[in-house]
Amino acid sequence: MNHLKSFFTALVAGFILTACSSLDISDTRPADVKTIDKSDIQWQQHLKQIKQIQHYSSQGQIGYISSKERFSSRFEWNYAAPTDYTLKLYSTISSTSLVMQMHNTGMTISDNKGNRRSEADAKALVREIIGMDVPLEQFAYWLKGQPDEKADYQVGENHYLASFTYPLDGTVWSADYLNYHEEKQPALPKDILLKNANQTLKIRVDNWTF
């Protein structure tokens, strides 16, 4: 088990050396964002359309920063259900890749060299092997710009989700939606900044399929 953990640690470290150029997304949350009321008709119509997207995939780049880890990589995300999704992290420079696959009995993490590890507790496995402590259950909704309607969220003047804060597991996550693919129907996020007190995720989505 220790050998496998060491291998994955080295694998993630490899992303630091071989990853794409750093994302040009600021670490700082934007200030003075103009917002509109949540009852806005265009926002409510947009939210309804977002909710109807149940199965989707996206590709882009992700940057992760914490006191223990710092890396940037390409990603492919495929989502079908809370117990059926896959996140692949990979480098375009080398053959390095890592796949997190959720299934009915938990999560399996594997790499391009055939190493794999499965556990029922997906979040604990990701934390142990990769060092990331991210809210996997919520990520599928946050990525497409769908807030928890009971949470504190703001709608921008563009009639899309601008930001939200969400308390979870003793910490508070914030999300800022900096740019959208407005050529899509419905418009879907392009640049996202996710933060809590100890972690920062920068996400740039290049392509959406649904």
Curated annotation (Swiss-Prot):
Q: How does it sit in the membrane?
A: Lipid-anchor
| Location in or out of the cell | Cell outer membrane
A GO CC term attached to the entry? cell outer membrane
Q: Where is the lipid attached (N-palmitoyl cysteine)?
A: 20
Q: Per its UniProt record, what Pfam families does this chain match?
A: LolB (PF03550)
Listed under GO biological process in this entry are: lipoprotein localization to outer membrane; protein transport
Q: Which UniProt keywords are listed?
A: Cell outer membrane, Chaperone, Lipoprotein, Membrane, Palmitate, Protein transport, Signal, Transport
- Mark the residues modified by lipid (S-diacylglycerol cysteine): 20
Output the superkingdom of the source species. Bacteria
Mainly resides where? membrane
Q: Where is the signal peptide?
A: 1-19
Function, as annotated: Plays a critical role in the incorporation of lipoproteins in the outer membrane after they are released by the LolA protein.
In which family does this protein belong, per the annotation?
A: Belongs to the LolB family.
Description of how the protein assembles with itself and partners: Monomer.
Q: Could you tell me what this protein is called? A: Outer-membrane lipoprotein LolB
Q: Which organism is it from?
A: Mannheimia succiniciproducens (strain KCTC 0769BP / MBEL55E)
